[in-house]
Amino acid sequence: MAPKSSQSSQGLSQRSKQQTISSFFTPKPSQTPKAPPKPAALAVPNGADQDDDDDEDEDIAPPRQLTPARKRSIDEQHEDEEAGRSSPPKRVRVANDEPRPSLGNASATTLNAAKPPKITERTSKFLFSSSPVVRDETDAKDDAAATQKLREKLHEKFVKKLGRPDSFAELRRRNKVISEDNGNGEEGEGEEDEEEEEPAPKPTKGRKGAATKKTSKLTPMELQYLDIKRKHMDTVIVMEVGYKFKFFGEDARTASKELGIVCIPGKFRYDEHPSEAHYDRFASASFPVHRLQVHVKRLVKANHKVGVVRQLETAALKAAGNNRNTPFVRKLTNLYTKGTYVDDIEGLETPTAGAQATGYLLCVTETNAKGWGTDEKVQVGLVAVQPATGDIIYDDFEDGFMRSEIETRLLHIAPAEFLIVGDLSKATDKLIHHLSASKTNVFGDRSRVERVEKPKTMAAQAYSHISNFYADKMKSSQEGGSEQGAILDKVHQLSEHVTICLSAMITYLSDYALEHVFDLTKYFQPFSARSYMLLNGNTLSSLEIYQNQTDYTSKGSLFWTMDRTKTRFGQRLLRKWVGRPLIDKERLEERIAAVEELKEGEHTIAVDKVKFLLGKIKTDLEKVLIRIYYKKCSRPELLAALQILQDIASQYLSAKTPEQSGFSSILLSEAVSNVPKIYEDVNSFLEKINAKAAKDDDKYGFFREEFEAEDINDLKLSIASVEDDLNTHRKDAAAKLGKTKVDYVTVAGIEYLIEVKRKSVEEKKVPASWQQISATKTTLRFHTPEVKRMLQERDQYKESLAAACDTAFKRLLDDIAAKYQSLRDCVSSLATLDALLSLATLANQPGYVKPTFVETTELDIVGGRHPMVEQLLLDAYVPNDVHLSGDATRALLVTGPNMGGKSSYVRSAALIAIMGQIGSYVPAESAKLGMLDAVFTRMGALDNMLKGESTFMVELNETADILRSATSRSLIILDELGRGTSTFDGVAIAEAVLDYVIRDVGALTLFITHYQHLARLQDRFNGELKNVHMSFEERDGGKEVVFLYEVAEGTSHRSYGLNVARLAKVPEKVIETAEVKSSELEESMGISRVANMARMVKGLLEDGGEEGLERLIEGIEQL
């Protein structure tokens, strides 16, 4: 017998070799008992028992089954191929010479006695025996030889059927790829429930590193995806697969995070990294086709660039074509970013979330003009485009090191996306980062930033690019030569920096198929046209023009107060008016007259008609028109827009001239007379459309029959012919089944099924050529070969018809786009009516009055109120007067207790001036307003850590900018200038600035301060400066102060900061200590003042000069 140690060493040597396929299918010796011995008399000759031998082989060593399909196919092939081949003799255990004792005549002792010859080595350990059974060495050798023969036989069989064992995993992957290449070219296309991908096979416990040698084979669809992805690595790609959209790799992880959809594990990288060698597919995530815009919008809002890859072939046409075994042709059809997303169908009829969401894409470039540090000057060019409406703003300007000019423009435009051409200076870069990087920024949401290179020859390239762009547009347009020349002249007059931005913007938007927006040169507008009041960034923020300073929402802002519009395009126009008050008195008078006419005729037929028609508009017509121009409009959208325009135009058919409009105001009469001009065009478009089909988005019935194209009509007839043949085929099918009549049924979307009852006479008559499609316990459902052929033919016609219908729809959109300008002018007129009606609704609020405008620079407001605080307060707002004039009192020095209402008072004056020049009524008893060219503010105490500037540095920078920019027609508001440094320095700077503003600039000024020392400046300026304070009452010995919020003449000598501390719930112990220290300081200051006066009296007695007498009187007044 072989010793146990030698057997174990033999097993180790076998395991050290590479495992064969047969080793996976052969049971381990410890798990499978040996077959019982057979009597020798039952043996048969080899040739006569061939099949039995094969069966016995499987009984002895049944292979381990991976999948039922594979086991079955292997067995069948094994039986077929081994039928005619001889096999080696079967090993049969030889019986002992002695007869076996039967159970009947055996004694208990004999039965229970150990029988060593009958006990194997494997079972000996389970016996209650003290010593192991010793086997005969000859039997052990025979067993080993037979087992080795059996293994070799199985090994040969599997090598013959499957190739080398170590290539089994590769074969399985190859089979999977072949199955995907058949039919549609990739897995699961056109199926509703795609099969789950099989996980990669686990590496075998063989040689070290065996798993890393396996290389994955990507499917044709994944290779197609990789090809597109490599060209757009910065884009989240979503690919159409059947009627699902799929993300792959890292994009799947991004989509799972942003959209909350499941990510199926797999490769995340695109470079075949060894760390992901155990995966044979990309990670993926998917959603249904009809949810595309919902998910794209969410990704775009999260600042991702999204690319949509669509199938350009249909299943039926592909099956009939020559490329039926290749993947579907796919192409990147759409790109979206925050500034270029114009497919927001869902949001057209919903109320706007916030006024700051303007959707502008802003392109900016910059060069150093001169200097560096605080003397740095940069030349900035910008172009801002609103793709959703077609508006374009451009500007070219010089800016200082504070970047106040560019900040003003950014706050006005509030872009959703930046396109930066070349490198920007650190100051500009930090400003853009500061304004755009936070979710709670002044734009209301984080903005996306894209950068492009700027070569040294960019200016020349840009000029050439723009010239070619517009020259090509002119060739394909229908405009006359003079109009073409005018457009080119207008473009060539743009400055170098604007030209660079325009060229970069055209190139950038070409990727999104939105470059057509630049065809509309009529809507190019310069930002810095001097027909508007300048409201810089600080003013917009301090006066809360567009959003409050608490949570950066529109509630509590001036725009929120004035917005009573009924349409989205009217709201956008009013937002522009609020940020750009007029300084042209003639235009301002026209606007205010229109508001007055609407206010006075509130319940007249003409005004009620305008309100009613605007109230009916639930569609954003301005956005729909530009989507028509881009050819991105849907059928229901188009129908709704055309029907609204037709309805409104039909109401004013009798008002084709301004005189027939029913209004006396120029603005109103011109706006109303513009509306009916589009009636004939809109009517001609609607005549071609089947309203019911368009509403249901039915492309096949979209056009009325008399306006259908010939190819559409032919394809419809072909489909009808096939369906007629299908109906006729029922007689043939009935004859084959022996029935008089057969009806088609539709189950689970599968049409033209023929049902046959189980166990019926008809079931036996079903031809073998009929294909069973589905079945139940009682019914079988079939397609005949003729039905299959005709259905395939019908599907081809249907898909050709769909393509023809899309082409015809595009032609209609082209025809409408040719009339874009007249349609846009009509919508602009409706927006003007809506904005004017909003101002008229505000004017009807109690306490609002029509302002009077004068040529001189003055503010004469009686009973003025803060427009936003008044609406938010539950109590009545206390009105105050403001009297400023360039000829008389030019500045007010405002003092008073903390929280006494100083800031609210000066803000109300500025807001009333702005509202008046917007063309609105104002919250006051009366208001006489001069035409201001700008409002400047320096309010609040903020540092700027991004620029490394302290609070005091920010104060002085902003103040210096105001002093450089202000004119005698400006209004300046300075709030507690100098508080960021020591008292002496602060007083000195505040006095110097106030002196400069009054003497040199001559602007109207409201100056808030707590420095009583400045009050003595009143006498220096001979009535140009006046002291006022916010009145109050002291109670309980000065411990309690009641704020009256009324402006009174004179100076407040105390700020009552300790009372504010009590209101803020500062601990009483702290307040008591502060009171003691305050008394001590006041006493020491009083003593020093008395000593100073004593010296002044002494000097007066010695010198007797008038100058010493004046200083003595000032000192006595301060006491």
Curated annotation (Swiss-Prot):
Description of how the protein assembles with itself and partners: Heterodimer consisting of MSH2-MSH3 (MutS beta). Forms a ternary complex with MutL alpha (MLH1-PMS1).
Span list, region Mispair-binding domain: 212-339
SUPFAM superfamilies tied to this protein: DNA repair protein MutS, domain I (SSF55271), DNA repair protein MutS, domain II (SSF53150), DNA repair protein MutS, domain III (SSF48334), P-loop containing nucleoside triphosphate hydrolases (SSF52540)
InterPro entries: DNA_mismatch_repair_MutS-lik_N, DNA_mismatch_repair_MutS/MSH, DNA_mismatch_repair_MutS_C, DNA_mismatch_repair_MutS_clamp, DNA_mismatch_repair_MutS_core, DNA_mismatch_repair_MutS_N, DNA_mismatch_repair_MutS_sf, DNA_mmatch_repair_MutS_con_dom
Biased segments, Basic residues type: 204-215
Function: Component of the post-replicative DNA mismatch repair system (MMR). Heterodimerizes with MSH2 to form MutS beta, which binds to DNA mismatches thereby initiating DNA repair. MSH3 provides substrate-binding and substrate specificity to the complex. When bound, the MutS beta heterodimer bends the DNA helix and shields approximately 20 base pairs. Acts mainly to repair insertion-deletion loops (IDLs) from 2 to 13 nucleotides in size, but can also repair base-base and single insertion-deletion mismatches that occur during replication.
Xref: PROSITE patterns: DNA_MISMATCH_REPAIR_2
Primary location group: nucleus
Residue ranges with Basic and acidic residues bias: 134-148
One Gene Ontology cellular component: nucleus
Name under which the protein is recorded: DNA mismatch repair protein MSH3
Record family assignment: Belongs to the DNA mismatch repair MutS family. MSH3 subfamily.
Alphabetical UniProt keywords: ATP-binding, DNA damage, DNA repair, DNA-binding, Nucleotide-binding, Nucleus
Coiled coil: none
Protein's organism: Phaeosphaeria nodorum (strain SN15 / ATCC MYA-4574 / FGSC 10173) (Glume blotch fungus)
Molecular functions per Gene Ontology: ATP binding; ATP-dependent DNA damage sensor activity; double-stranded DNA binding; mismatched DNA binding
Highest taxon above the source species: Eukaryota
Chain residues that bind ATP: 896-903
Region (Disordered): 1-148, 173-215
Subcellular compartments: Nucleus
